[in-house]
Amino acid sequence: MANVVVVGAQWGDEGKGKIVDWLSERADVIARFQGGHNAGHTLVIDKKVYKLHALPSGVVRGGKLSVIGNGVVLDPWHLMKEIETVRAQGVEITPETLMIAENTPLIMPFHGELDRAREEAASKGTKIGTTGRGIGPAYEDKVGRRAIRVADLADDATLEARVDRALQHHDPLRKGLGVEPIDRDALVAQLKEIASEILPFAAPVWKVMNEKRKAGKRILFEGAQGALLDIDFGTYPFVTSSNVIAGQAATGVGIGPNSIDYVLGIVKAYTTRVGEGPFPTELLGADGKPDADGERLGTRGHEFGTTTGRQRRCGWFDACLVRQTCATSGINGISLTKLDVLDGFETLKICVGYELDGERLDYLPTAADQQARCKPIYEEMEGWSESTEGARSWAELPANAIKYVRRVEELIQCPVALLSTSPERDDTILVTDPFAD
């Protein structure tokens, strides 16, 4: 049976939630392998809206096993609130349907406090645009070998020792930022209280995943955010704190890379970004605010963050960036989403290269100062007046919409496997089945 990795191929918000839900119907296991609750997934099923941040998208589908892997950083309090919310919507979540890797690092309240304090202290131009939810500091503690992990909740003595080690590092940091010391006893009490709620879901996920693989079960690996936010291959330092590309799927759950059969990249038919950082095709007017086309994309596409509510920056499709992502993630095919948002544009533009200091480039350079100076080189295409919303076959698409899709394929050097024409899961055109053996 084929195992599929789903990754965002831009800066996140590409519509992964819908595609994962669409694919999860035929998967047996759905696993989150990186990120935290800073990335939101919006699912629309039978007109009911589910907004998930920590939970895998597969939880809304009965009879599936959802997994939170060790590559994730997990806020246990947020997770339990999210479980309560989803249960209130009629979704059953039990230790039989949700497993959390025992070696998953936990996000502590002091991680979010540190995140926000640093962002507030940062001077203009150096802010990252973090969600302030503690993701970065939690990953820092993981790499610094002072993280508190799910398994630590099972033993009081171990837990208190882990807390003491973390505080030895964090209290001096807080002092330098003018933040009060952490209340050690209160934190320990909070952790002991939440332990009884989290531990029933704890499991040796690496073992379970390998058993499922050997049994021929179909596994769907669900990434958060987008590859252009990858800590190594994104627009550093305006990135997230984990690896987002497909290679992380294996290490993020404890399964071998030879277990991955297909990588599906989720690509929006235009480009958006939340927060700071370079964005060559961003549509801005002379006043630095979105121009008419940028406003139109944002309004039609409902471009507001699931997690923060922040308005997303909008721009034309950037073929160079997506082509890079197809290479770094080994993408076999893409799911092109939100094609319907482009309905009604007389002219569409696609970025086919950059001009940097008089030279033409076909990729975005690594250095941040060069990224900021890159100017897009556009190719124009004729738009279409007809509606593509809700289309479920190529025959329902306008000729110019098909031309646009085909040109995207040519420029990114990767085929379209799925085409999404609305937030509804069934408004999807299947070209290549990622789960096909």
Swiss-Prot record:
Write down the EC number. 6.3.4.4
Binding of IMP: at which residues? D13, E14, G15, K16, N38, A39, G40, H41, T131, R145, Q225, T240, R310
Query: What positions constitute the catalytic site?
Result: D13 (proton acceptor), H41 (proton donor)
Q: Which GO terms describe its biological process?
A: 'de novo' AMP biosynthetic process; IMP metabolic process
Recorded hits in InterPro entries, A to Z, give: Adenylosuccin_syn_GTP-bd (IPR018220), Adenylosuccin_syn_Lys_AS (IPR033128), Adenylosuccinate_synth_dom1 (IPR042109), Adenylosuccinate_synth_dom2 (IPR042110), Adenylosuccinate_synth_dom3 (IPR042111), Adenylosuccinate_synthetase (IPR001114), P-loop_NTPase (IPR027417)
Chain residue ranges for the region called Disordered = 281-304
Give the protein's cofactors: Mg(2+)
Task: Give the metabolic or biological pathway.
Answer: Purine metabolism; AMP biosynthesis via de novo pathway; AMP from IMP: step 1/2
GO terms, molecular function = adenylosuccinate synthase activity; GTP binding; magnesium ion binding
Listed under subunit, the entry gives: Homodimer.
Tell me the protein's name: Adenylosuccinate synthetase
Organism the protein comes from? Ruegeria sp. (strain TM1040)
Q: What is the lineage of its organism?
A: Bacteria, Pseudomonadati, Pseudomonadota, Alphaproteobacteria, Rhodobacterales
